[in-house]
């Protein structure tokens, strides 16, 4: 693994060096033509682009008649600036021995690249993306070379089935953006990401090992809606959909968490719904409520998504619907929900208060049924054991011969004639 990694690094450094160097007497990296680069505090060499290498030239600052370096300096077509600083930046002119213009050069100072900061994230279980940023500002034109490879364990079956593990280029999307995307990744595999920062003064590489399970972070849910429940002044119904980027497959589902709060209340209440909707039963009557949701892999892989944009809803101010009893002896008036500021308590309803999406009753019923089933089973086992023991004792009483002296003290025995009286 280490040899493959070092080999990949050597290839990328070679490519970066090729980008920096050229075969002409004045290597041109990229950027505007005629621009050459150096590092502050270091010696900088400028070369005259319009002459043959080694031809003596004279150097001037643009717009200044003062000679900086004459043709007899022995440096040929090059100009040497010792310990360059910001005052040395600008345009330089080189002239041949006959005074003809050899060319113009613009000096720009900056720093070599440092290892970039790289992070990766997967919005689904098939693709992931990596982003990067420079760890220090170089002040020079910068490019990034990005690639990845699949990590394998020596002797693993997966390696025997797929000997090719890369490296492959990680396409930057869009081109030139600080982001690349890996498509068709394997959920249970690990990958090594290589991001190399290149500028005219060198190259620096960052390697990052990632696992799709650990970097999984879905996009937030979409289509969040908050609606009132007619007739229930303390209830709100929230519904949403899966994020469009998450493939709907039965083996890769999402779970959700929902937060809500009344207006002007800073604290959020949190619940974890069982599906794609939730009924809030403790809303504050008459106040608008903010609601938001986030998503996560249902097996807790990765992390929670960011929160969805907030949606707002206000509980219903209508009356609770009532039914007249079948026997018709009780005449009831329409029940009006009291206003929020009214000191009078609400009138009790004659009908049971339904609880939407409240599964506690069903859970209790299941628990009672399970308990009754266990007790019935234990009773049957005890009865079977008692019956078996009784049958065994009865069979033993019929087949076995009585032991000597058994019941002798209870049953009298007639004396034979002539037997002496003891």
Swiss-Prot record:
<comment type="subunit">
    <text>On IL11 binding, forms a multimer complex with IL6ST/gp130.</text>
</comment>
<keyword id="KW-0812">Transmembrane</keyword>
<keyword id="KW-0964">Secreted</keyword>
<feature type="glycosylation site" description="N-linked (GlcNAc...) asparagine">
    <location>
        <position position="127"/>
    </location>
</feature>
<keyword id="KW-0732">Signal</keyword>
<dbReference type="InterPro" id="IPR003961">
    <property type="entry name" value="FN3_dom"/>
</dbReference>
<feature type="region of interest" description="Disordered">
    <location>
        <begin position="335"/>
        <end position="355"/>
    </location>
</feature>
<feature type="topological domain" description="Cytoplasmic">
    <location>
        <begin position="392"/>
        <end position="422"/>
    </location>
</feature>
<feature type="disulfide bond">
    <location>
        <begin position="170"/>
        <end position="180"/>
    </location>
</feature>
<dbReference type="InterPro" id="IPR053073">
    <property type="entry name" value="IL11/IL27_subunit_beta"/>
</dbReference>
<dbReference type="InterPro" id="IPR007110">
    <property type="entry name" value="Ig-like_dom"/>
</dbReference>
<dbReference type="GO" id="GO:0004896">
    <property type="term" value="F:cytokine receptor activity"/>
</dbReference>
<feature type="disulfide bond">
    <location>
        <begin position="120"/>
        <end position="130"/>
    </location>
</feature>
<feature type="transmembrane region" description="Helical">
    <location>
        <begin position="371"/>
        <end position="391"/>
    </location>
</feature>
<feature type="signal peptide">
    <location>
        <begin position="1"/>
        <end position="22"/>
    </location>
</feature>
<feature type="glycosylation site" description="N-linked (GlcNAc...) asparagine">
    <location>
        <position position="194"/>
    </location>
</feature>
<dbReference type="GO" id="GO:0032502">
    <property type="term" value="P:developmental process"/>
</dbReference>
<dbReference type="InterPro" id="IPR013783">
    <property type="entry name" value="Ig-like_fold"/>
</dbReference>
<dbReference type="InterPro" id="IPR036116">
    <property type="entry name" value="FN3_sf"/>
</dbReference>
<keyword id="KW-0393">Immunoglobulin domain</keyword>
<feature type="short sequence motif" description="WSXWS motif">
    <location>
        <begin position="304"/>
        <end position="308"/>
    </location>
</feature>
<keyword id="KW-1133">Transmembrane helix</keyword>
<dbReference type="InterPro" id="IPR003530">
    <property type="entry name" value="Hematopoietin_rcpt_L_F3_CS"/>
</dbReference>
<comment type="similarity">
    <text>Belongs to the type I cytokine receptor family. Type 3 subfamily.</text>
</comment>
<feature type="disulfide bond">
    <location>
        <begin position="48"/>
        <end position="94"/>
    </location>
</feature>
<feature type="domain" description="Fibronectin type-III 2">
    <location>
        <begin position="220"/>
        <end position="317"/>
    </location>
</feature>
<dbReference type="GO" id="GO:0005576">
    <property type="term" value="C:extracellular region"/>
</dbReference>
<dbReference type="GO" id="GO:0060322">
    <property type="term" value="P:head development"/>
</dbReference>
<dbReference type="GO" id="GO:0016020">
    <property type="term" value="C:membrane"/>
</dbReference>
<feature type="domain" description="Ig-like C2-type">
    <location>
        <begin position="27"/>
        <end position="110"/>
    </location>
</feature>
<feature type="topological domain" description="Extracellular">
    <location>
        <begin position="24"/>
        <end position="370"/>
    </location>
</feature>
<keyword id="KW-0677">Repeat</keyword>
<keyword id="KW-0325">Glycoprotein</keyword>
<feature type="domain" description="Fibronectin type-III 1">
    <location>
        <begin position="112"/>
        <end position="219"/>
    </location>
</feature>
<protein>
    <recommendedName>
        <fullName>Interleukin-11 receptor subunit alpha</fullName>
    </recommendedName>
</protein>
<keyword id="KW-1015">Disulfide bond</keyword>
<keyword id="KW-0472">Membrane</keyword>
<keyword id="KW-0675">Receptor</keyword>
<dbReference type="InterPro" id="IPR036179">
    <property type="entry name" value="Ig-like_dom_sf"/>
</dbReference>
<comment type="function">
    <text>Receptor for interleukin-11 (IL11). The receptor systems for IL6, LIF, OSM, CNTF, IL11 and CT1 can utilize IL6ST for initiating signal transmission. The IL11/IL11RA/IL6ST complex may be involved in the control of proliferation and/or differentiation of skeletogenic progenitor or other mesenchymal cells. Essential for the normal development of craniofacial bones and teeth. Restricts suture fusion and tooth number.</text>
</comment>
<dbReference type="InterPro" id="IPR003599">
    <property type="entry name" value="Ig_sub"/>
</dbReference>
């Amino acid at each position: 693994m280490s040899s493959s990694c070092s080999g990949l690094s050597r290839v990328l450094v070679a490519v970066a060096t090729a980008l920096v160097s050229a075969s002409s007497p004045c290597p041109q990296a990229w950027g505007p033509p005629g621009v050459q680069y150096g590092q502050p505090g270091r010696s900088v060499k400028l070369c005259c682009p319009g002459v043959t290498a080694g031809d003596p030239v004279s150097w001037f600052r643009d717009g200044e008649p003062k000679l900086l370096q004459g043709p007899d300096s022995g440096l040929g077509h090059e100009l040497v600036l010792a310990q360059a600083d910001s005052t040395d930046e600008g345009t330089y002119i080189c002239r041949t021995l006959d005074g003809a213009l050899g060319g113009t050069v613009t000096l720009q100072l900056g720093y070599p690249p440092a290892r970039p900061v790289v992070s990766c994230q997967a919005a689904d279980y098939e693709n992931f993306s990596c982003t990067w940023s420079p760890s220090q500002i170089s002040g020079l034109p910068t490019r990034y070379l990005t690639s990845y490879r699949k990590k394998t364990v020596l002797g693993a079956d997966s390696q025997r089935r797929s000997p090719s593990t890369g490296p492959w280029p990680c396409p930057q999307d869009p081109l030139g953006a600080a982001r690349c995307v890996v498509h068709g990744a394997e959920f249970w595999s690990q990958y090594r990401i290589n991001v190399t920062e290149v500028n005219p003064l060198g190259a620096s590489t960052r390697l990052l090992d990632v696992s799709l399970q650990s970097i999984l972070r879905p996009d937030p849910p979409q289509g969040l809606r908050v609606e009132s429940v007619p007739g229930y002044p303390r209830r709100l119904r929230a519904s949403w959909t899966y994020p469009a980027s998450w493939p709907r497959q039965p083996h890769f589902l999402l779970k959700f968490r929902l937060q809500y709060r009344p207006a002007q209340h800073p604290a959020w209440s949190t619940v974890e719904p069982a599906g794609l909707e939730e009924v809030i039963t403790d809303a504050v009557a008459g106040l608008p409520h903010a609601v938001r949701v986030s998503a996560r892999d249902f097996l807790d892989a990765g992390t929670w998504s960011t929160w969805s944009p907030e949606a707002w809803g206000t509980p219903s101010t209508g009356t609770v619907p009532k039914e007249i009893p079948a026997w018709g002896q009780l005449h009831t008036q329409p029940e009006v929900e009291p206003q929020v500021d009214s000191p009078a308590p609400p009138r009790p309803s004659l009908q049971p208060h339904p609880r939407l999406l409240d599964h506690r009753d069903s859970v209790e019923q299941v628990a009672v049924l399970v308990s009754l089933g266990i007790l019935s089973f234990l009773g049957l086992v005890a009865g079977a054991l008692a019956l078996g023991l009784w049958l065994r004792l009865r069979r033993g009483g019929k087949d076995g011969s009585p032991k000597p002296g058994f019941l002798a003290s209870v049953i009298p025995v007639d004396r034979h004639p002539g037997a002496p009286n003891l």
